[in-house]
From Swiss-Prot:
EC number: 3.2.1.20
Protein name: Lysosomal alpha-glucosidase
Residue ranges constituting the P-type domain according to the UniProt record: 80-131
Function per UniProt: Essential for the degradation of glycogen in lysosomes. Has highest activity on alpha-1,4-linked glycosidic linkages, but can also hydrolyze alpha-1,6-linked glucans.
Organism placement in taxonomy: Eukaryota, Metazoa, Chordata, Craniata, Vertebrata
Glycan-bearing residues: N140, N233, N390, N470, N652, N883, N926
Active site residues per record: D518, E521
Keywords of this entry: Disulfide bond, Glycoprotein, Glycosidase, Hydrolase, Lysosome, Membrane, Signal
Gene3D superfamilies assigned to the protein according to its UniProt record, in alphabetical order: Glycosidases, glycosyl hydrolase (family 31), Golgi alpha-mannosidase II, Spasmolytic Protein, domain 1
Organism: Rattus norvegicus (Rat)
Stretch forming the signal peptide: 1-27
């Protein structure tokens, strides 16, 4: 073991012992269980909290002399220790506002922001830790087969109650690109998130990182071996580990930070004293508040195109504070500290390494990528039928019809009313006969107000003990849409079986195809319960993060209520995830096909089971624009099936807004139009013919691109790729892409530049270096059964970019979509449903580089069966273009996909007019070449599942 003295910032008394670690571990594979854990199993199979920290270039500090008294409140900071750069000050009063006397009694420094020479800074703490503030000391460091262990000791308590004075540190060098360390209480078992994480038994052979420890104050320093950049340095502020307050700070190597969802903000988070609160909450999206999901993972971009990520697996209420130094502080109200650091080195790899831990996204059924339509206010089957008929008559594709609460009897789950929905089952059968699917809302809260025997879900749930209980052991009763309600405990194995039974029984009446699970933060219309909440430390913790409403019980249930695995205090942020797991499981066992679940509440690992929509957004240009970074954020978090309510949910949309939102929504991975009961209807056919034509053009483009989109989801499912991705994921070495969040990519090949402001007929977007072809050059409508739209207005066919911002024409009927040179994408004739579009002929769009090369692939299966990869029931074909020749490679071919007909190949970037075109050696005479666009269109008659070769000269 190599021990050395660190380079400290001051020449003062104390040791900064650094131990350099260069060991590593074999990659394990994560499996997130269905939470069917017995209490005795939990200790061995849970991994606890994953914590994230961003690295920083500064060296770890060395403590100055400090005269330690018996109690923390008697400490006094040495005046010279308070000379800390304002942006590097770490808050010593996170729990409450305090006076100078109270601050100094904590042993901290007091410097009002107004007294700083550079002027006041909003958010800058007045009371902050001196570098000498006592922390833990590292002792008994020893090697293990997979890393290191050590003991951490603290000699004086902090100002939070129930400090844990002795801690255990375990460091695991799990893979070459993944470091894992945990800080626990060795004498008392604490709650750990029930996520089964990779188990690694040996050290990685060639890690990309080195690990060092500061002995006193204790800290972990993680460096990137290549260049020595510090990625994580926890010595910048003292470690806290009390029963209900855990705090860990780290420096960051840059101010370019993304992640930490869910929030309404730009893609890159501000480090100007920004607090992000993670405590799932039913609240309409707005800036600066905790929203529906909690994802304690961040990705940091570094100079030179490198990136790393950090994940803190902790489901307790927490704040994450970003400050300008730059630095980050985690403050959690419970659990343990369990930190994963992902070394990348490029951003794309960071996301994949994170998903190696939390799980790769599920593969959605093909129909789930079509258009979904819903509205709160479809109050009868007659209205729903009319909506579907109107969509068909006006030639708008519709794959999935939804219902909100309207279908229910007294707004109770697993019922339908006999007034407007007496023939509900018949309506769903009719949708199926038309090649469509059906989904409806299901809230978790179960009505408890009826007499015994009147409502089977509650009666059966009560008998089987599936509900969350209060301090007396009785079901906690809150209030949601049906009135008095109980809340299922989805961490209880019995609840999973009960939920499956309820889903199966209702499906036997109404054969729905997917589930929309809403209100699952869980939402509660009263605070806590009808009886209130007990006055205890879980309801009134010593530290309350910045939650909307100021209390953990606000708009949800009591924190001290009891669930199978732990208290709701610990499990709250997992409620939506556990319901998604239960719903996915129930659909698999009920329908026997691929599940399709869309959930409002999410947590880390959610994408493995379900998709997400962004909640009750407003019909406003602001929320239209914010939807882009939110879609990108969730793709980075491993939830690629995500979308916002097209045209907005709350408030009345306008025609222009709805057209522009539909154009952008055509490139949401999950495409749904949905709005509120009190807002004007906004189905596409409600607007003028001009608006309808513009929207229909966007629909046509999406449906033509579905084979490419489906192939992207396959990549997400098997490799951890993103579907919609920020530009920096493909171009990390171009700093101009880092903050772009008004554009998005579909995979590596398509760049979408939407109009996000009113009254605009042009749009400005960033084009990374290279050639970009306008997708309007590729004819798609002739392949399908939809009517042709009006001819496209003049457009710039090819963009030759040096890496620059460009202004493009964008009339109301146009969304700019560009195909990146070097890629081949599959297309298919668009139709009114995916049932029909999957039968249409296919095409290839080939975008050549200046050297005349391109590549791509197509994944295809039956679109809904389970286990297609395991059974080999799929087709995977790759395409490549080089030297004026296009060939395919049959990676794996079955009947599903092998018989797809290829009818058109459009080649972009053909600089010289060809005189001869061959398809499998046979001359093609009816090709067309455009000298203006440099495009070559070749009609062919080929099968995707057979080898082919296309030549031109």
């Amino acid at each position: 073991m190599n021990i050395r003295k660190p380079l400290c910032s001051n020449s003062v008394v104390g040791a900064c012992t650094l131990v350099s670690l260069t060991t590593a571990v074999i990659l394990g594979h994560l499996m997130l269980r269905e939470l069917m854990l017995l209490p005795q199993d939990l200790h061995e199979s849970s991994s606890g909290l994953w914590k994230t920290y961003r690295p920083h270039h500064q060296e770890s500090y060395e403590p100055a002399p400090l005269h330690i008294q018996e109690h923390a409140e008697q400490l006094r900071a040495v005046p010279t220790q308070c000379d800390v750069t304002p942006n590097s000050r770490f808050d010593c009063a996170p729990d409450k506002g305090i006076t100078q006397e109270q601050c100094e009694a904590r042993g901290c420094c007091w410097v009002p922001a107004g007294q700083v020479l550079n002027g006041p800074v909003m958010g800058q703490p007045w009371c902050f830790f001196p570098p000498s503030y006592p922390s833990y000391r590292l002792e008994n460091l020893s090697s293990t087969e997979s890393g290191y262990t050590a003991t951490l000791t603290r000699t004086s308590p902090t100002f939070f109650p129930k400090d844990v004075l002795t801690l255990q540190l375990e460091v695991l060098m799990e893979t070459d690109s993944r470091l894992h360390f945990m800080i626990k209480d060795p004498t008392s078992k604490r709650y750990e998130v029930p996520l089964e994480t990779p188990r690694v038994l040996s050290q990685a052979p060639s890690p990309l990182y080195s690990v060092e420890f500061s002995e006193e104050p204790f800290g972990v320093i993680v460096r990137r071996k290549l260049g020595g950049r510090v990625l994580l340095n926890t010595t910048v502020a003292p470690l806290f580990f009390a029963d209900q307050f855990l705090q860990l700070s780290t420096s960051l190597p840059s101010q370019h930070i993304a992640g930490l969802g869910e929030h309404l903000s730009p893609l890159m988070l501000s480090t100007e004293w920004t607090r992000i609160t993670l405590w799932n909450r039913d609240v309409a999206p707005s800036q600066g508040v905790n929203l529906y999901g909690s994802h304690p993972f961040y990705l940091a971009l570094e100079d030179g195109g490198l990136a790393h990520g950090v994940f803190l697996l902790n489901s307790n209420a927490m704040d994450v504070v970003l400050q300008p130094s730059p630095a980050l502080t985690w403050r959690s109200t419970g659990g343990i500290l369990d930190v994963y650091v992902f070394l990348g080195p490029e951003p794309k790899s960071v996301v994949q390494q994170y998903l190696d831990v939390v799980g790769y996204p599920f593969m959605p059924p093909y129909w789930g990528l079509g258009f979904h339509l819903c509205r709160w206010g479809y109050s009868s089957t007659a209205i729903v039928r009319q909506v579907v008929e109107n969509m068909t008559r006006t030639h708008f594709p519709l794959d999935v019809q939804w219902n909100d609460l309207d279908y229910m009897d007294a707004r109770r789950d697993f019922t339908f009313n006999q007034d407007g929905f007496a023939d509900f089952p018949d309506m769903v059968h009719e949708l199926h006969q038309g090649g469509r699917r059906y989904m409806m809302i299901v809230d978790p809260a179960i009505s408890s107000s009826g007499p015994a025997g009147s409502y089977r879900p509650y009666d059966e749930g009560l008998r089987r003990g599936v509900f969350i209980t209060n301090e007396t052991g009785q079901p906690l009763i809150g209030k949601v849409w049906p009135g008095s309600t109980a809340f299922p405990d989805f961490t209880n194995p019995e609840t999973l079986d009960w939920w499956q039974d309820m889903v199966s029984e209702f499906h036997a009446q109404v054969p729905f195809d997917g589930m929309w699970i809403d209100m699952n933060e869980p939402s509660n219309f009263i605070r806590g319960s009808q009886q209130g909440c007990p006055d205890n430390e879980l309801e009134n913790p010593p530290y309350v993060p910045g939650v909307v409403g100021g209390a953990l019980q606000a708009a949800t249930i009591c924190a001290s209520s009891h669930q199978f695995l732990s208290t709701h205090y610990n499990l709250h942020n997992l409620y939506g995830l556990t319901e998604a797991i239960a719903s996915s499981r129930a659909l698999v066992k009920t329908r026997g096909t691929r599940p399709f679940v869309i959930s409002r509440s999410t947590f880390a690992g959610h994408g493995r089971y379900a998709g997400h929509w962004t909640g009750d957004v407003w019909s406003s240009w602001e929320h239209l624009a914010y939807s882009v970074p939110e879609i990108l954020q969730f793709n980075l978090l491993g939830v690629p099936l995500v979308g916002a309510d097209i045209c907005g949910f709350q408030g009345n949309t306008t025609e222009e807004l709805c057209v522009r939102w539909t154009q952008l929504g055509a490139f949401y991975p999950f495409m749904r139009n949905h709005n509120d009961l009190n807002s004007l209807p906004q189905e596409p056919y409600r607007f003028s013919e001009t608006a309808q034509q513009a929207m229909r053009k966007a629909f046509t483009l999406r449906y033509a691109l579905l084979p490419y989109l489906y192939t992207l989801f396959h990549g997400a499912h098997v490799k951890g790729d993103t579907v919609a991705r920020p530009l920096f994921l493909e171009f990390p070495e171009d700093p101009s892409t880092w903050s772009v969040d008004r554009q998005l990519l579909w995979g590596p090949a398509l760049l979408i530049t939407p109009v996000l402001e009113p009254g605009k007929t042009d749009v400005t977007g960033y084009f990374p270096k290279g050639m970009w072809y306008n997708l309007q050059m590729v004819p798609v409508e002739t392949l399908g059964s939809l009517p042709s739209s009006s001819p496209a207005s003049s457009f710039r066919s090819i963009v030759h970019s040096k890496g620059q911002w460009l202004t493009l024409e964008a009339p109301l009927d146009t969304i700019n979509v560009h195909l990146r040179a070097g890629y081949i994408i599959p297309l298919q004739g668009p139709s009114l449903t995916t049932t029909e579009s999957r039968k249409q002929p296919m095409a290839l769009a080939v975008a050549l580089t200046e050297s005349g090369e391109a590549s791509g692939e197509l994944f295809w299966d039956d679109g809904e069966s389970l286990g297609v990869l395991e059974r080999g029931a799929y087709t995977l074909v790759t395409f490549s273009a080089k030297n004026n020749t296009i060939v395919n490679k049959l990676v794996h071919v079955t009947k599903e996909g092998g018989e797809l007909q290829l009818r058109e190949v459009t080649i972009l970037g053909v600089t010289t007019a060809p005189t001869q075109v061959l398809s499998n050696g046979i001359s093609v005479s009816n090709f067309t070449y455009s000298p203006d666009d440099k495009s070559l269109s070749i009609p062919v008659s080929l099968l995707m599942g057979e080898r082919f070769q296309i030549d031109w000269s």
